[in-house]
């Protein structure tokens, strides 16, 4: 008699399916970069556009060189594969968008760290870039080059009004379309594209963003800062990183029930960290989720799928945690 076992794993139908997922993300990132350039040209930000193009080209060249060296070490000599079956272009675009005006040595180190993580942790793909971005942000912090709206608001103990917030970034257009913080509008458009192409685990993205939105909206009401939710969603590259790194297909939950819980839990963590270490909040949250939480949820995924009582209980606990989080943030900040 054949014995059956329950396997908590992510299954991809074929190697071709994996390539399709990578291709969809790559296409969307190319469109994102092109639209960012076009929008900033229309806004008259020519200097920023040149800096962005330079950053992307440098990132692509450096990533290609080191990826090819890795291929040589592995005794693979198919250069075409680097761009057609690997995440080289996608990783280059993400790092390039994050490293505008960054020192080339730091850019190179960030790429090396990204590729190192990607190759030692075989299941990680696009989210490996988080480790490189982490290095870039830490460098900016220690060189006093991290004067972003998030850090300025924190340094002012979150006591700023709507007009002061707009002045930080020279108007609302730079929040919505600005090159420095990765346009939330374009991020939403790319999410719609990936959702349409069935290339993203939308349950995770929606539950994550919805959790953060609820917490920030209620915090804004209780502290007389109705603008707070829009500020949080449009800064710190929150939407961009959520769409491109939160749902890495091999290291994020696969079943709908666990995906929703995953998004809610990480949303609570991010909301708290936005008040403590704002620029690193999303990065640290996603890394934590991939290293610890995702594996645990996958281990209990079968129980959650077929034991609705347990699943509903966990959802209720999550809602209680959201309320507690709002109360604590309102009292402290």
Place the predicted regions along the sequence by residue.
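N-terminal signal-anchor module of multipass membrane proteins
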Residues: 1-72, 324-333
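Structural signature of hydrophobic alpha-helical transmembrane segments
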Residues: 48-62, 100-109, 170-185, 224-238
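Hydrophobic, membrane-inserted alpha-helices
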Residues: 29-33, 63, 67, 87-96, ...
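C-terminal ends of transmembrane helices
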Residues: 6-13, 66-80, 113-124, 188-199, ...
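Long hydrophobic alpha-helical segments that form multi-pass transmembrane helix bundles
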Residues: 122-192
